[in-house]
Amino acid sequence: GETLPLVVALHGGSGHGRQFLWSWLRAVRSDPCILIAPTSSERTWSLMNPEADSQRLHGLVAYAQEHWSIDPERILLTGMSDGGTFSYVCGLQSDSPFTHLAPCSASFHPMLMEVVDPARAQGLPIYLMHGALDWMFPVSVAQEANTALSAAGAKVVYREIENLSHSY
């Protein structure tokens, strides 16, 4: 049978997966996939203790693979704001099941690259989006992420959106 891509979409801080799911409906209707929009275990994603939410996300991927015909080459982790930041944290771990990352309006700490396995970053497709008018995380944060990830060998597509602030 036909395999479908899996998209795991992470909401922003104090958000909820049920609400974030709605922002994806049009895209899913035009480009079919299996979509999971989980809710963080706390008020936001466990940025300081990544294992807490990372293990849950790994479990969701495994569940999806058991129940649907998932394309193993197209497993995307994306997120908005804190969800985007967590997509870096979780998606860059060496045991990550995700084949693609797409952080949006996310924070990125350069120290993160010091704990990333160079083999994990090498060739990893990352679609990085950030609004030029972002008031929460300045666009310079995304520019630094683009530079650091590209230098590590990731295949980064960088998209700075001219009139976008901190939104999706």
State each model region's role.
Residues E2-T3, W45-D82, P97:
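Gly/Ser-rich "nucleophile elbow"/oxyanion-hole loop immediately N-terminal to the catalytic nucleophile
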Residues H100, S105-Y168:
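The feature captures the conserved acid-bearing segment of alpha/beta-hydrolase catalytic domains
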Residues E2-L6, D31-I34, D71-R74, D95-H100, ...:
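Loop/turn elements at helix/coil->beta-strand transitions in domains of secreted/extracellular proteins
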Residues H11-G15, S41, Q65-W68, M80, ...:
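Cell-envelope and extracellular/periplasmic
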Residues R18, W22, S54, H58, ...:
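Short, surface-exposed alpha-helical segments at coil->helix boundaries
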Residues E73-A121:
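Primarily recognizes the serine-hydrolase "nucleophile elbow" in alpha/beta-hydrolase
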Residues G1-L6, D82, C90, Q143-V157:
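A domain-start/cap signature at the N-terminus of enzymes
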Residues G1-S46, P110:
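Short substrate-entry loop that stabilizes the transition state in hydrolases
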